[in-house]
């Protein structure tokens, strides 16, 4: 009788509920099938059915009729499946029903609620969330919040089952289009990621290691799931044979997979922010660091390549986030950045220079926040991983890791130059020493490889040959001896990476000056000029020791040719100013160099003369300097004592070299020792260059030189570095046999002085019958053959 006076849609709904059967939780099959047909036939009928079913479920819930609630949810699930084309008509009622049922403490009711929610998410493809209205979004957000509370497993009869149900709900959410960030749904990403973190993180190191192993063993096999009921609601067999704890962790990994593969970029970015803030609050322990690294690298691997940069920039912005306690001293966020940069996954679209400048500003702040003297900073930079403040060290390795993946050809060069600019001579000694530590790590990581003939390695080496002369200016511009020593040590390590060159006087004097040795020739002269200036500002004994190593290494690399540049430079560095008497300490290191040359060339007269010179200085020198084998650090101040005159003049040394070793030092090499042979960049003799002539130019591809080549190659040009550039001018050659003037021929004839100063590109090499080219013109070719300056990327403001 109770059905006679009811509307048809109400009758159809009520007939689906079993009558008089206690404990029954399944709806009547035939009435449910007809109800589905009736509701699907018309949208107004569906709206009425959904509204009445919702009121029926709420009524049953408030009267604690759990079985009827379960039946109502199953009816709702069937209607969602059958009426998916009109899902937007019933969406608000469905969500309100689920919101009521999610407040239950009965696990069976909660299970039916989650199943219905998963079905709703799976069949929501026909409707647009934007058409559901504000009421739907508000209720849906409350429902997500309710599922989040459920995933905590608090105040439940079975916490583990409760967590499992909550995670299944978030698995369904992150696999559907309702996962959003608009309006009232902006908290969904934070709920989703925190439900994963609170169920996968543990204070027990053993459990964290267990989760790490699970990620490594299972995450690689995950694939994007199709929009089906099996894909949205976790397959039943996924937990078969596993205990509930392992099943929970597997489901956490699955939700992470959904967030970074199936949600929109904004949802993913908001989730990442919450992930970073969660990890930032953890302690700096090895297990925690491993956990964070594994999770970050795995989600980076899942994330589409074009979106990976968003994860990185979320970490970068969190370096100074107000939501992180003591963000200016936090070490976990820099570690996350390091973990991403050091991973095998490259990040397309990464603006390397912008990132470097951002990291550099934080690096400077970290240096300035630590108060210490120069010697303390030097000692810390000797063992940076152990002694530098943790945050500072992590920021340092983040910068050096920017070159781990090559995003464009000139990336290494840009990073090196940016660091060099960041720590210019106007910055503090501490910042300069930290920058030099970065140089040390950069060149070690790039050059410390067995593939010496590889193209990238050759490119890096060629760049450093051009760049170190500028970076080495700290040898004499810095007022701090610790900065000078650190510069010398890093520069010496670079020299140790180079292989000995075949450059010799025969190469220089009897071949055209346009050779692949021009970069090496320029490098030798630039280095010798720095040595000259450095000798004038020596102040501690450690500088004495490291200079000895540098000049010895230059001889090992370039042989007697280096002597023609280094020895005159050392003699010029004996006097701090032009009219000052020579300093004893500068004389001592010069005497050591002469002894070293004599030993290598087996010229006993040079050895004995050098020792006599050194003995004559013994009364003015610390006894520790007289021990030639000593190479330990000593911060003892050097004496400023001077002598009236130099005991062993340069002319006497040069005469001895040419007389006793004519095969090594031919007579033509005498001019290279003279004052006039100084590098044109640092002498007034450039004013004597001849006027340019109007002659047809030709191009040369010999722009770079390579120190990493086999001895038999005679430094052939690197085809990978081939670049066409107008270097010099010659007369038109009508015959193949006509040759340009050699350096030896140019040296043999005087040149005509001119008051006109020419640029390197205006220098001419002429035939033997034409006017001879002065020595300086030939050496000046080095400058003309320097590589084209590296252009900044278009996104970098100049």
Swiss-Prot record:
InterPro entries recorded: ARM-type_fold, EFR3, EFR3_HEAT-like_rpt
Biological processes per GO annotation: mitotic actomyosin contractile ring assembly; phosphatidylinositol phosphate biosynthetic process; plasma membrane organization; protein localization to plasma membrane
Any coiled-coil regions, as ranges: none
Keyword flag Phosphoprotein: yes
A single GO cellular-component term on record: plasma membrane
Origin superkingdom: Eukaryota
Pfam families (alphabetical): EFR3
SUPFAM superfamilies linked: ARM repeat
Sorted UniProt keywords: Phosphoprotein
List of residues that carry Phosphoserine: 210, 726, 729
Sequence similarity: Belongs to the EFR3 family.
The protein, known as: Protein efr3
Lineage per the UniProt record: Eukaryota, Fungi, Dikarya, Ascomycota, Taphrinomycotina
Gene this chain is encoded by: efr3
């Amino acid at each position: 009788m109770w059905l006679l006076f009811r509307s048809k849609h109400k009758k159809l709904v009520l007939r689906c509920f079993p009558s008089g059967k206690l404990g029954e939780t399944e709806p009547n099959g035939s009435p449910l099938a007809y109800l589905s047909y009736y509701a699907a036939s018309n949208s107004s009928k569906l709206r009425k059915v959904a509204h009445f079913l919702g009121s029926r479920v709420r009524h049953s819930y408030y009267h604690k009729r759990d079985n009827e609630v379960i039946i109502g949810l199953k009816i709702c699930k069937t209607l969602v499946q059958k009426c998916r084309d009109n899902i937007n008509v019933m969406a608000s009622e469905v969500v309100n029903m689920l919101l009521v049922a999610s407040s239950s403490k009965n696990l069976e009711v909660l299970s039916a609620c989650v199943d219905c929610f998963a079905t709703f998410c799976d069949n929501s493809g026909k409707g647009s969330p934007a058409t559901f209205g504000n009421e739907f979004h508000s209720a849906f957000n409350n429902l997500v919040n309710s599922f989040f509370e459920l995933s905590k497993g608090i105040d439940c009869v079975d916490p583990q089952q409760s967590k499992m149900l909550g995670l299944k709900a978030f698995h369904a959410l992150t696999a559907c289009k309702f996962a959003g960030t608009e309006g009232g749904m902006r908290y969904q990403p934070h709920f989703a990621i925190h439900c994963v973190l609170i169920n996968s993180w543990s204070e027990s190191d053993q459990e964290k290691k267990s989760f790490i192993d699970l990620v490594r063993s299972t995450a690689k096999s995950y694939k994007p799931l199709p929009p089906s009921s099996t894909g949205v609601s976790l397959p039943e067999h996924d937990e078969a044979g596993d205990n509930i704890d392992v099943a929970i962790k597997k489901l956490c990994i699955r939700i992470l997979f959904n967030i970074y593969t199936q949600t929109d970029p904004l949802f993913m970015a908001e989730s990442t922010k919450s992930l970073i803030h969660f990890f930032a609050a953890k302690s700096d322990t090895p297990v925690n660091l491993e956990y964070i690294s594994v999770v970050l690298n795995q989600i980076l691997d899942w994330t589409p390549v074009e979106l990976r940069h968003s994860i990185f920039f979320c970490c970068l912005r969190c370096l100074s986030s107000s939501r992180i306690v003591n963000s200016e001293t936090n070490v976990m966020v820099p570690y996350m950045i390091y973990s991403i940069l050091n991973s095998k996954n490259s990040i397309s679209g990464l603006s390397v220079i912008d990132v470097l400048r951002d990291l550099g500003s934080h690096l400077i702040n970290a240096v300035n926040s630590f108060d210490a003297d120069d010697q303390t900073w030097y000692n810390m930079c000797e063992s940076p991983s152990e002694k530098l403040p943790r945050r500072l060290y992590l920021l340092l390795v983040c910068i050096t890791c920017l070159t781990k993946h090559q995003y464009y050809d000139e990336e290494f060069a840009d990073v090196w130059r940016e660091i060099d600019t960041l720590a210019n001579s106007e910055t503090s000694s501490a910042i300069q020493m930290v920058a030099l530590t970065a140089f040390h790590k950069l060149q070690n990581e790039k050059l410390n490889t067995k593939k010496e003939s590889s193209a990238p390695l050759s490119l890096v080496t060629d760049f450093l040959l051009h760049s170190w002369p500028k970076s080495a200016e700290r040898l004499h511009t810095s007022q701090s001896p610790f900065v000078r020593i650190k510069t010398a040590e890093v520069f010496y390590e670079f020299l140790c990476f180079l292989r000995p060159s075949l450059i010799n006087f025969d190469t220089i004097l009897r071949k055209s000056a346009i050779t692949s040795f021009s970069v090496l020739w320029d490098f030798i002269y630039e280095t010798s000029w720095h040595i000259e200036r450095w000798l004038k500002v020596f102040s501690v004994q450690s500088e004495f020791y490291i200079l000895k190593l540098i000049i010895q290494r230059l001889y090992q690399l370039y042989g007697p040719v280096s002597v023609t540049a280094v020895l005159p430079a050392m003699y010029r560095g004996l006097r701090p100013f032009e009219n000052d008497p020579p300093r004893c300490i500068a004389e001592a290191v010069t005497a050591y160099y002469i002894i070293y040359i004599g030993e290598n060339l087996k010229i006993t007269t040079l050895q004995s003369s050098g020792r006599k010179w050194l003995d004559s200085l013994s009364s003015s020198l610390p006894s520790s300097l007289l021990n030639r084998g000593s190479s330990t650090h000593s911060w003892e101040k050097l004496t400023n004592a001077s002598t009236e005159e130099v005991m062993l003049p340069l002319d006497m040394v040069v005469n001895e070299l040419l007389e006793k070793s004519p095969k090594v030092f031919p007579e033509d090499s005498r001019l290279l020792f003279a004052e006039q042979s100084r590098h044109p960049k640092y002498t007034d003799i450039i004013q004597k260059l001849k006027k340019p002539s109007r002659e047809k130019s030709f191009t040369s591809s010999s722009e770079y030189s390579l120190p990493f080549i086999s001895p038999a190659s005679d430094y052939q040009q690197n085809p990978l570095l081939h670049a066409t550039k107008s270097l010099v001018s010659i007369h038109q050659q009508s015959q193949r046999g006509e040759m340009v003037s050699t350096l030896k021929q140019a040296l043999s004839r005087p040149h005509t002085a001119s008051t006109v100063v020419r640029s390197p590109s205006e220098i001419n090499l002429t035939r033997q019958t034409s006017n001879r080219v002065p020595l300086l013109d030939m050496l000046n070719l080095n400058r003309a053959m320097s590589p084209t300056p590296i252009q900044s990327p278009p996104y970098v403001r100049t």
